[in-house]
UniProtKB/Swiss-Prot annotation:
GO terms for molecular function: ferric-chelate reductase (NADPH) activity; ferric-chelate reductase activity; metal ion binding; superoxide-generating NAD(P)H oxidase activity. The lineage of its organism: Eukaryota, Fungi, Dikarya, Ascomycota, Saccharomycotina. Residues 523-532 have a biased composition (Basic and acidic residues). It catalyses: 2 a Fe(II)-siderophore + NADP(+) + H(+) = 2 a Fe(III)-siderophore + NADPH. Cell surface metalloreductase. May be involved in copper homeostasis. Residues 519-543 are annotated as: Disordered. Residues 321-419 form the FAD-binding FR-type domain. This is Ferric/cupric reductase transmembrane component 7. Residues 161-320 form the Ferric oxidoreductase domain. The gene is FRE7. Residues 1-45, 129-167, 216-237, 287-292 are extracellular. NADP(+) binds at residues 411-414, 578-579. Heme 1 binds at residues 197, 271.
């Protein structure tokens, strides 16, 4: 019987047996007066205010850089503009920014932190930890955690933890979208802020359990398991709380790095189904307690607005196009484990560094994957994608024998917020298929170098095998043809590092205009091996016609794995420097730490004003 286990307070009142007594009612009223149940909803507002402040500060930073970039004299009409920031304010700003970047650009060991789902960027880590600390303090510092008896009201710890969890839901859903209002405000694309979506979800899950446990603990403390069973049967709130926390736990488990790594496509389909179940069950559970359902109303309004905007502007409902209009992509194998997709004509505007989501119209239509895009040299007006065969979608595409595929395009997304034209030096650092991100910057800004502040564009590309260079053969030939003088003047520098020592016929260090494939290819391979890369080879070769000699020395191929830290430190840093990197985790780790170290030059060298880093990753 429950009465056999009945908590007795110091004043002699029983928490269960005396529940209908006048003294019990008076003590309940005193407990509510001391810690009002209705006040607990303020803790949800405290969380919202904190996140709003972070977003506001990020917005200020974005607007400041937009103003700063627009005031630069990289266009004739901007010269001698009265809107140029004062020298004093500019110096203060550059020093503060450099100090911030000195800390925030640094990277933690990628393998360990990524495996644990912890942000690898120091800057992101600090924001996440600040938010975590703030919410933990607001949840656990206020007392009391419990009321003397459960009948006096819900445990204050449970109520405030629950309302804090609900207040995070709008941010969780908003940050999940490929188009989201928070990303637009802070100037980050969705793949950059996806880590905040993950950690907002983790905090939401944590506070959900903090909400649940005090109810269970107090019921057991007062009347044992029988009391818990009675509360379960009598309270609809208890029963309705199970589905949302179950959905939330399944969302967390399926989102763990190890689960995403091995079951990515299952995760993609399961994620939105569980999210819908979580939202509906949570709405039923909280309505209308403390008006907390209004957080969920805001969630659905923002989420649907983002979804509609994405479909209408980026996706399959674009005005002037038929619903889910498909396009044809040419498919070809361009090396071991690499597929080339070319769409000859695209009806969308895009910027360097952006990517699209591709969905093939076949049995794999439910799968869509992101790929960086760049202009195709072979088909002007077309776009090209390089896809490394790994698992799922990319592996099926690589193993298919199709020369053409019907695809659906969603995008473009991502890109860089800063105006590249305002920098003096641009350094493009990439490995493998990361060239898809970096090359379009050279393609776009190389031809207009003389119209901007840009003085030098440097591309350093690390590949495993020499044959990988053929991925962008046409594009590099076009660039070396059209921008030959810039190459010769050292205003465009291209270095390709080949980690292995394999040699494939038809790939040469200087990207000749024409190649006679009927020639003795083994002789060519031997000559390449014997040649000192980066130097002019004056020996004639029957493989190439006379025009080939024009391209000697324009592009340097180095047959070794580079020390990227040394490569970056050897750069002739200019006045305003932009570093763009894309590739492996180890590359981004090295580049991040190296560019963080370069911030010291902003303090020590008056001829260096800025070292900005933009990195791309497909870890989302």
């Amino acid at each position: 019987m429950i009465e056999e286990r009945d908590l007795v307070l110091s004043n002699g009142i029983h928490c269960i047996a005396d529940i209908h007594s006048e003294l019990y009612a008076r003590l309940k009223k005193e407990s509510q007066a001391a810690t009002p149940w209705v006040y607990q909803k303020q803790y949800g507002k405290f969380v919202t205010y904190f996140v709003a402040v972070i977003i506001f500060l990020s917005l200020i930073k974005k607007l400041a850089f937009m103003y700063y970039d627009s005031s630069e004299e990289f266009l004739p009409e901007k010269k001698n503009s009265p809107t140029t920031p004062s020298v004093f304010l500019a110096r203060i700003m550059t020093k503060l920014v450099a100090f911030n970047r000195y800390i925030c650009y640094r990277k933690f060991p990628t393998l360990i932190f990524s495996y644990l789902g912890i942000p690898t960027s120091v800057g992101t880590f600090l924001v996440v930890m600040a938010t975590t600390l703030y919410t933990l303090l607001y949840c656990f510092v206020p007392h009391p955690f419990y009321r003397p008896c459960a009948g006096f009201g819900s445990p204050p710890l449970s109520v405030r933890a629950g309302i804090m969890a609900i207040s995070l839901v709008p941010f969780v859903f908003s940050l999940s979208g490929k188009i989201n209002v928070i990303g637009w405000l802070v100037g980050l694309s969705y793949e950059k802020i996806n880590i905040y979506h993950q950690w907002a979800s983790i905090l939401c899950l944590f506070f959900s359990w903090v909400h649940v446990i005090p109810f269970l603990r107090q019921a057991r403390h007062e009347g044992g398991y029988e009391r818990m069973h009675q509360r379960w049967k009598a309270s609809d709130m208890w029963r309705s709380g199970v589905p949302p926390i179950l959905f939330l736990n399944l969302l967390w488990l399926s989102s763990l790095p190890i689960a995403r790594r091995h079951f990515y496509e299952i995760f993609l389909q399961l994620h939105w189904i569980l999210a819908v179940g979580f939202y509906i069950s949570l709405f039923y559970h909280v309505y209308p307690e403390l008006n907390s359902h209004m957080y969920l109303v805001a969630t659905i309004v923002v989420w649907f607005a983002q979804l509609f905007y994405r479909l209408a502007v980026k996706g399959y409902l674009r005005p002037g196009r038929s619903f889910m209009a498909s396009t044809i992509a040419n498919v070809s194998i361009v090396g071991e484990g690499c597929v080339e997709l070319i769409v000859k004509d695209v009806e969308m505007a895009y910027s360097p560094g952006q990517h699209i989501f591709v969905r093939t119209i076949d049995k794999g239509i439910i799968s869509n994957h992101p790929f960086s895009i760049f202009p195709s040299a072979k088909y002007p007006g077309g776009i090209k994608m390089l896809i490394r065969a790994q698992k799922g979608f990319s592996k099926r595409l690589y193993e298919s024998n199709d020369d053409m595929k019907k695809i659906l395009i969603d995008g473009p997304y991502g890109g860089i917020e800063r105006d590249i034209r305002s920098f003096t030096n641009v350094y493009l650092i990439c490995s493998g298929s990361g060239i898809s991100t970096c090359l379009p910057f050279l393609q776009k800004y190389g031809p207009i170098l003389h119209k901007t502040n840009l003085e030098v564009i440097t591309l350093d590309w690390v590949v495993r095998h020499r044959e990988d260079i053929s991925w962008i053969r046409d594009e590099m030939c076009t660039l070396s043809n059209n921008l030959r003088q810039l190459f010769l003047d050292g205003k465009i520098v291209v270095r390709i590092y080949v980690c292995s020592d394999s040699t494939v016929p038809g790939i040469i260090k200087t990207f000749p205009q024409t190649i006679d494939t009927a020639s003795d290819q083994s002789d060519l391979a031997k000559r390449e091996k014997d040649t000192e890369f980066g130097q002019d080879d004056t020996e004639s070769n029957s493989t190439f016609d006379k025009s080939n000699n024009e391209y000697k020395g324009l592009i340097t191929i180095i047959p070794s794995k580079p020390d990227l830290n040394q490569v970056i430190n050897d750069y002739q840093i200019g006045f305003r420097n932009c570093f763009i990197c894309s590739g492996s985790d180890s590359l981004r780790y090295t580049v991040g730490n190296s560019v963080a170290g370069l911030q010291a030059k902003v303090f020590s060298n008056k001829n260096v004003e800025e070292c900005y880093l933009h990195s791309e990753s497909f870890g989302y």
